Amino acid sequence: MISNTMKVSLGMAIGAIGVVATPAGAAALDPTFGSAGTTSTAFGGYGAAARVVIQPDGRIVSAGQNALGDFALARYTTSGALDTSFNGTGMVTTTLSGSCSGQARALALQADGKIVVAGASCPNFTATRNFTIVRYNADGSLDTSFGSSGKATVNFYAGASEAYAVAIQGGSIWVAGYAGSGFALARLTGSGTLDYSFGSGTGTVTSTVGTSSALANSLAIQADGKPVLAGYASSGGTVFALTRYTTTGALDTTFGTGGKVLTNVGGTFTGNSAVATSLAIQSDGNIVAAGYANSASGGYYRMAAVRYTSAGALDSYFGSGTGKVLTAIGSGNAIGSDVAIDATGGIIVGGYSSAGSYRQLTLNRYDPYGNQDYSFGPVATAVGSANAAVQGLAIQSDGKIVVAGYGNSPVTFVVARYQ
């Protein structure tokens, strides 16, 4: 199984990157953004962006980590330049105390413009990772009204726990990942304390999913306030795993089997592996999970998208009646890392594919029925002579697609925009 995160680090500059775009369809780099559609930002070493969001004013925020395990953020203008109204440089790093490096994996924007980043660190100089959430003001400064000087941690008391996803709902902050060997979910108040009206008075819930281990990579909140988690679980190999909870933290028994859904995406064989890395909820309530799966023992991973009804059943209107699509892209593994729904109901998946010795930024689009949209791509972009990958994507109000991830050698934040 391939992890959807990569421990890389970040050097203090922004500049053009050598890119060669190889679109197979109409999607192409936007030449009005950065240098020929891309920009790179380094934070003093090596590093990578994990996620990206678009502010209402069109400015772009990406978050990840640097070589020291600091949380790292960059904000860009609509043209791809670093926004100097953000911490004076367009960049922010936050050091987290503890005996292990921090890892920032998730990013969300509040309605008031505050920025929430979630991941993991080892607080109080312990060796055990805990959920870690940091909130910033719109100018990039730490929001000292949140947690302890802008930082909050959640200990599930079940061994190590790490956050991989964050979502904002009203005044609540939802954070999901794993604790011990199961799915983990916490709800925080706007001040960064656990919300004790959730999870039987604890503010947290954990769920055993599958047979041995499970991890939630993504989180979305339905219109009715119910949280949906997606990731993977062990079950005769690894499979897409989803859970849905009530607003008070109980597993929602109207979803799947007892609130859980397990999907073998590529088939049943020795070594079958499938991981949901991302999740989106359509306006009609259907749920789209994207990631990757293999379809033969020892075979390459393929980009995967699976659609479920609001009850957790595979959607027979998607993927030629199966509810599932697998797409081979490039000459090796094709990994989906993030998903978004566009204004027409199309499903955009970003990740990476292989071409020769290197990974490339990769975007793919499916129509609302799961058919490959060849008028779009897939499109792959090489970033220098080095591995590159999309780890997060967001769609602007004008339909342009912004992706964030890593590339170059030494490795840096990479942000690109497609039209």
PLM segments and residue spans:
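Bacterial N-terminal signal peptides that target proteins for export
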Residues: M1-L10
